[in-house]
A protein has these predicted regions:
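Bacterial N-terminal signal peptides
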Residues: 6-17
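Sec/Tat signal peptide C-region and signal peptidase I cleavage site
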Residues: 19-23
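N-terminal edge beta-strand
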Residues: 26-49
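Extracellular/periplasmic metallocenter environments
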Residues: 28, 78-113
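Beta-strand-rich interaction surfaces with strong enrichment in secreted/lumenal proteins
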Residues: 42-44, 72-76
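Short beta-strand/loop motifs in extracellular/secreted proteins, especially
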Residues: 52, 62-64, 106
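Asparagine-centered strand-capping/turn motif at beta-strand->loop junctions
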Residues: 56-58
Length: 113
């Protein structure tokens, strides 16, 4: 009987250890879409001091490069694909970004407040 109890307890402990992190613990997601060589929305607001995930969906056929010198981030997003960028907690302020392949039209900013 003791062996069965120990095995059940060990099994439950293993199950709990392998349980994924709850969604409430995950950083918030901020969606951006690339379409017709533009970002939409062209301004997003995030909470200053809190990390977040930038989810960028490229609806165009061609690739676009998300680039922010302010954030020191560069990421190519293939046409028809979505990428997720984990962003660190930002100080309050405005951070600009562009689509490097279409800098005249693909522009935006992240406002941390």
């Amino acid at each position: 009987m003791r062996l069965v109890t120990m095995l059940v307890v060990a099994g439950l402990a293993g199950l709990l250890a392998s349980t994924p992190v709850l969604a409430a613990d995950a950083p918030p997601e901020v969606a951006l879409t690339i379409e017709k060589n533009r970002f939409s929305p062209d301004e997003v607001r995030v909470k200053a001091g809190a990390p977040f995930v930038l989810v960028i969906a490229n609806k165009d056929a061609g690739a676009e490069e998300f680039e922010s010198k302010d954030l020191r981030v560069e990421k190519v997003i293939p046409g028809g694909k979505t990428v997720r960028l984990r962003m660190p907690a930002l100080k309050a302020g405005t951070y600009t970004f562009v689509g490097e392949y279409h800098e005249k039209t693909a522009q935006g900013r992240i406002v941390a407040e």
